[in-house]
């Protein structure tokens, strides 16, 4: 079971070596999906519906709209993520999804992407860190959403300022997004580059 926000149980995270294990174990579009989540801090549904029109390879940025808040988020490309996107770039239809096969699939439910991710975790030999929740329910501390927490933790471990971490994980309003400056973009790019590389994929 996914970890409900109201449970009060701390969400788990993945260290870089574990993220690499996930990417190496995953197949097809899942490899890029995991990298998108880890290097942008985006939620599962947002990662699946990112479009090529939001990818700026020259500017090394990726822009998407959060389904939960409606906020537009612009994040910087990590070198690992940029390398993989460069390999896939070249479409003349920028409105299409980066992950067209996964974009049409459900995220929740027994056959949803969240459960599929758990299978990848088990195949990679990683612990879901299952704990007892309210009542008799058993819940997992490490799910796909833990990649979002891992992103912010990785930035914090590299002493990236909290305000920059907040920008990278999403603004609260469109007005905040419009306050972006070139200087801030450079700061965001420098912050993301501090996350350790996953090595060859």
Where are these regions (language model features)?
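DNA/chromatin major-groove-contacting recognition/catalytic segments
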Residues: 17-21, 73-79, 83, 87, ...
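C-terminal catalytic core of tyrosine-transesterase DNA break-rejoin enzymes
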Residues: 31-35, 39-46, 145-172, 179
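Short helix/loop segment immediately N-terminal to the Walker
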Residues: 126-141
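Short, polar N-cap/turn motifs at the start of nucleic acid-interacting alpha helices
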Residues: 54-61, 138-141, 160-179, 190, ...
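C-terminal secondary-structure termini that scaffold catalytic or DNA-interacting sites
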Residues: 87, 91-93, 101-105, 131, ...
